[in-house]
């Protein structure tokens, strides 16, 4: 029997890359919609104000390219290099960045992301989010005005005027002339830094390795004899304890005593070399090495003091030698009682998140009340009508301030419950306040789970703050697009009520719903 000749059915496809113009891209793509909808002029103005290069320096990249790349990075949870690679492979992303033609070349070097994070802080991202919120309010006002004009042409002019007036009042409260408008919701959380869980043994062992590395580099640069730091012996003793399944306290304490002794010996060796030979030997090291050594020296004093006193806490405790600005933040949550990162105080206005306070040190968020109120008035020109926050915000001092400012307090009053608080209407009102306040808890969950706000990979204090702010700015941009989608469906319902044929409506614009929700 003759065997059949096998031939593969899968042929290599040939890509036709003859097209270069991006004008013919479909408008229902989410990146195309982003490029057509965002207020790039306002964003470019905010970005250029942070450059401080009006009178000198090379020309900068377009703000649309920079901010658009940041949005892609945090929306897709990509690294700096992968973001540039994804943009080079995707014409829709290049359209959002404002490019007129497709190009496979990188739009800029990935190292520029670090410079951008150093330039832009949480204030810049808050200003951009504010511009999105004001644009959404402006679009809602224009939509209400168009509906009012359309309804005025109908026979039922009186009913249409009342409806349009109510819509306009809801969307543009500042026109009413009152000094209190809107609801301000505040809360605090912790943005975790990407770092190893700190233990005393790990910190001391890292300190020994860093001092040995600094001594080796100092001797190599200045051609000095290399002293014996006993690194292999120290590493062996450390592994004998750290690899134990159950670590007795006596062995941990003995290992800490040993590491403290050896670390002190190596520090003294380095100081003798840098001081006796010449006063300028220390400056021959790189700034990063000098900073690491000073951090190890400070960490040694903290660990030695806690070891002698038999305690496990101290002020400004270092938990990472490579990120000395990170502090332990006591949270008391079920998942983790202590988190390591920056503590942020955020406020929410109409679904948009603003970071009003970012600190690497632990602080009491109840002291941020006036900060939130000042920022709210600075952004919108009036104080909030209602303030909602956790119990920690509702102490006697803050309640007194809110009463003096004539701001409604959303929450239960202090003291024992009165008879009025036992009524069904009161309980329903309190349940409503709790539901409204849960929005900011959901915002933190979305920011951490979707936009990686709990995995800050930037290693510097300023870049870490910028990373956190960029995560919530990306969330605000998605909120802006969902608002556009809501307006499209609102327009559809309005046209259906007025008797328009659905076929005449631009139904293709509604197909963007799937992409906007992602």
What is each stretch, according to the model?
Residues 333-379:
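Electropositive, glycine- and tryptophan-enriched low-complexity nucleic-acid-binding patches
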Residues 57-61, 91, 388-396, 415-416:
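Acidic, metal-coordinating catalytic cores used for nucleic-acid/nucleotide bond scission
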Residues 100, 104-323:
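Active-site- or DNA-interface-adjacent structural scaffold in DNA-acting proteins
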Residues 28-71, 422:
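Basic, short loop/linker segments at the boundary and entry of helix-turn-helix/winged-helix-like folds
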Residues 72, 219, 368-386:
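Short, basic/hydrophobic alpha-helical segments
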Residues 290-295, 300-310, 428-518:
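Basic, amphipathic alpha-helical segments enriched in Lys/Arg and hydrophobic/aromatic residues
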Residues 29, 69, 83-87, 109-113, ...:
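Short, conserved catalytic/metal-binding motifs centered on acidic residues
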Residues 1-40, 154-165, 486-518:
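Charged, often Cys/His-bearing segments associated with DNA-binding zinc-finger transcription factors
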């Amino acid at each position: 029997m003759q065997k059949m000749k096998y031939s593969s059915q899968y042929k290599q496809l040939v890509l036709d890359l003859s097209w270069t113009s991006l004008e013919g891209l479909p408008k229902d793509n989410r990146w195309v919609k982003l490029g057509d909808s965002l207020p790039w002029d306002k964003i470019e103005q905010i970005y250029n104000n942070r450059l401080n290069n009006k009178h000198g320096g090379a020309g900068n990249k377009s703000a649309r390219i920079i901010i658009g790349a940041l949005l892609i990075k945090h929306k897709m949870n990509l690294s700096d290099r992968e973001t540039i690679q994804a943009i080079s492979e995707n014409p829709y992303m290049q359209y959002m960045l404002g490019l007129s033609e497709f190009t496979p070349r990188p739009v800029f070097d990935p190292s520029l992301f670090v410079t951008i994070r150093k330039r832009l802080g949480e204030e810049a991202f808050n200003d951009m989010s504010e511009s999105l919120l004001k644009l959404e309010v402006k679009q809602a006002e224009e939509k209400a005005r168009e509906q009012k004009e359309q309804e005025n042409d109908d026979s039922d002019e009186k009913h249409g005027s009342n409806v349009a007036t109510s819509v306009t009042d809801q969307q543009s409260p500042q026109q009413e002339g009152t000094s209190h408008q809107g609801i301000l919701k505040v809360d605090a959380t912790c943005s975790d830094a990407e770092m190893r869980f700190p233990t005393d043994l790990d910190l001391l062992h890292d300190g020994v390795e860093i001092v040995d590395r600094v001594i080796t580099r100092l001797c190599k640069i200045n051609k000095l004899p290399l002293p014996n730091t006993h690194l292999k012996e120290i590493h062996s003793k450390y592994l004998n304890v750290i690899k134990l399944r159950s670590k007795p306290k006596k062995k941990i304490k003995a290992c800490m005593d040993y590491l403290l002794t050896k670390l002190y010996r190596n520090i003294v060796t380095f100081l003798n070399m840098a001081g006796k030979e010449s006063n300028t030997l220390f400056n021959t090291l790189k700034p990063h090495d000098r900073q690491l050594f000073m951090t190890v020296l400070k960490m040694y004093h903290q660990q030695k003091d806690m070891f002698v006193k038999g305690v496990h806490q101290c002020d400004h405790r270092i938990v990472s030698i490579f990120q000395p600005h990170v502090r332990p933040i006591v949270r008391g949550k079920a998942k983790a009682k202590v988190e390591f990162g920056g503590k942020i105080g955020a406020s929410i206005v109409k679904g948009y998140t603003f970071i009003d306070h970012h600190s690497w040190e632990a602080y009491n968020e109840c002291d941020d009340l006036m900060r939130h109120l000042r920022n709210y008035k600075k952004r919108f020109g009036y104080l909030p009508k209602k303030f909602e926050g956790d119990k920690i915000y509702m102490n006697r001092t803050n309640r007194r301030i809110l009463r003096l400012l004539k701001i409604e307090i959303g929450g239960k009053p202090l003291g024992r419950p009165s008879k009025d608080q036992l009524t069904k209407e009161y309980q329903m009102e309190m349940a409503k306040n709790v539901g409204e306040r849960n929005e900011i808890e959901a915002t933190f969950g979305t920011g951490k789970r979707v936009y990686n706000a709990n995995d800050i990979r930037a290693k510097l204090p300023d870049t870490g703050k910028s990373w956190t702010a960029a995560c919530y700015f990306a969330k605000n941009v998605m909120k802006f697009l969902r608002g556009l989608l809501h307006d499209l469906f609102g327009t559809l319902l309005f046209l259906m009520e007025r008797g328009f044929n659905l076929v005449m409506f631009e139904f293709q614009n509604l197909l963007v719903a799937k992409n906007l929700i992602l």
